[in-house]
Design a protein with these regions (language model features):
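N-terminal, polar/Ser/Thr-rich
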Residues: 16-44, 69, 139
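Juxtacatalytic substrate-recognition/specificity segment
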Residues: 20, 47-49, 147, 176, ...
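Extended, low-hydrophobicity, Ser/Thr/Pro/Gly-biased non-transmembrane segments
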Residues: 48, 102, 107-194
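Solvent-exposed beta-hairpin/edge-strand motifs
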Residues: 57-83, 142-155
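Post-HExxH zinc-binding segment in Zn-dependent metallohydrolases
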Residues: 263-264, 268-269, 302-343, 421-425
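Amphipathic alpha-helical substructures
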Residues: 364-437
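Coil residues (strongly favoring Ser/Thr
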Residues: 56, 79, 92-93, 124, ...
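Bacterial Sec-dependent N-terminal signal peptides
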Residues: 1-23
Length: 437
């Protein structure tokens, strides 16, 4: 049952974004100012985005919701805001046209003024994520951000990163969220606080907040303490958690878990599993705060899913080894691997390096079954001390940055004196099945 739920979560959450894109422009930062009023179904947004092209360009392609109502798009030139012609050249595909072109390596500030539709008046809850394309983005880019959101009094705002300030006014409240470390996505939750119950816990100076609907205080306390234990483990073994806060939020709209940097949205069905003390998905999304939502694999490139899913799964197993013991670790490693072996080497099998999306049961099992097995072999070949040193250096070098598979191999080579570990890794991820040793 646990295996099926976790595989279902893999398929649901990670198939929201299927469009592949390799950007030719670097996104340096976002500064977003948003406002929501009770008499409007739209989120009014002014967004500043700094870009830096590596080459001379006359046009730039963004992924951006076709449902947005754009008022203007401009760029800053000689202290003046100049209008940019634009057009949607496909669904959620926004093309900016620079009549005089833009120069390589220069930094350009873009300003987008637009409104994005919400359903606040229908159910008093706004949940939008990267897959909604609510802000202009490039799929393979990460960037730091600052986000200011003004909402009606009594409403709360959650985003990625840290909550910097809350300012109360007569009829409204202004929230400021920020991440100085780059993030892969900007989720946004706006909700009526009175409808949710809250639990909080302080661990290692990190405030863990849990907002929930379908649990009692004892169940919520167990969930939040499990999250705290996971954070403690990864902080001690890999490196410091990059934020002062982690927010857990129950969502009734889907069944799985959606993870962002500092924000984890828990579907009601997943919460039911946690209430029964099955914490697999929670442990995974906590691990992803280090690798997945802390260190970011290069989206759309070979090895993306192996690094962003299989590696966090193995980190989860490392936590289980310490908390549940070696026998439980081996059992949990073996269970999905046996499921994978049922079709290993056959038509539905795919080399790990070639998986483009976990959009089938078989692909999910390859990532969740074979993937962690591969990391267990690399761990064993390195030895405990070198393996932990490898993880710590990987995190230190790439937290808030994009990690390509090539860079991942370079990091491994520092702990591979005779090349045997890289040779083993290449064999395991480029071939179908479980190659004989």
């Amino acid at each position: 049952m646990k295996l099926l739920i976790l595989l279902f979560w893999l398929i649901i959450v990670f198939t929201q974004t299927i469009l592949s894109q390799t950007s030719i422009v670097n996104v340096n930062s976002y500064d977003i100012d948003a406002k929501l009023t009770l008499n409007s179904e739209n989120l009014d947004i002014t967004l500043l985005c700094q870009i830096q092209p590596p080459d001379s360009l006359s046009e730039i392609q963004f992924i951006f919701s076709s449902e947005s109502k754009i008022r203007s798009i401009k760029y800053l030139k000689d202290d003046n805001w100049i209008s940019i012609p634009y057009q949607f050249n496909g669904k959620d595909s926004l093309l900016l046209l620079f009549e005089s072109g833009i120069l390589p390596d220069n930094k350009y500030d873009l300003r987008f003024e637009y409104s994005f539709p919400t359903n606040l008046l229908k159910d008093s809850l706004v949940i939008i994520d990267r897959g909604h394309r609510w802000y202009p983005l490039m799929l393979d880019q990460v960037a730091p951000f600052k986000f200011t959101c003004d909402v009606p009094k009594g409403y709360q705002v959650f985003a990625a990163g840290d909550l910097i300030s809350v300012r109360d006014h007569k009829d409204n409240t202004t929230f400021l969220w920020e991440s100085k470390s780059a993030v892969f996505k900007l989720p946004l939750i706006i909700f009526n606080r009175t409808r949710f119950k809250e639990a909080a816990f302080d661990s290692l100076g990190i405030v863990i907040d849990f907002f929930y609907l379908n649990a009692d205080s004892i169940e919520a306390s167990r969930v939040i303490k499990e999250a705290a234990n996971s954070i403690k483990f990864y902080s001690e073994h890999i490196g410091n958690y990059p934020y002062k806060k982690l927010t857990l939020f129950e969502v009734t709209q889907w069944e799985g878990i959606n993870t962002g940097s500092g924000l984890i949205m828990i579907g009601t069905q997943s919460l039911e599993m946690m209430k029964q003390k099955y914490y697999d998905a929670l442990n995974l999304t906590i691990a992803q705060q280090w690798i997945g939502a802390g260190v970011f694999a290069k989206y759309g490139s070979p090895g993306f899913w192996f690094l962003s899913l299989s590696l966090p799964h193995y980190l989860r197993l490392m936590y289980l080894r310490q908390t549940q013991g070696e026998e439980y670790f081996q059992q949990t490693l073996k269970e999905p691997l046996e499921k994978y072996k049922e079709f290993a080497g056959k038509e539905n099998d795919i080399p790990l390096i070639n998986i483009d999306s976990p959009n089938s049961r078989e692909k999910g099992l390859i990532l969740y079954g074979k993937g962690p097995f591969v990391f267990s072999k690399i761990h064993k070949a390195m030895g405990d001390e070198k393996w932990l040193s490898f993880l710590q250096n990987l995190y230190k070098s790439f937290c808030g940055k994009i990690l390509t598979y090539g860079e991942f191999e370079k990091q491994i080579s520092r702990y591979d004196e005779n090349g045997s570990i890289l040779a083993l890794l290449k064999k395991l991820i480029t071939q179908k099945g479980i190659p004989e040793e």
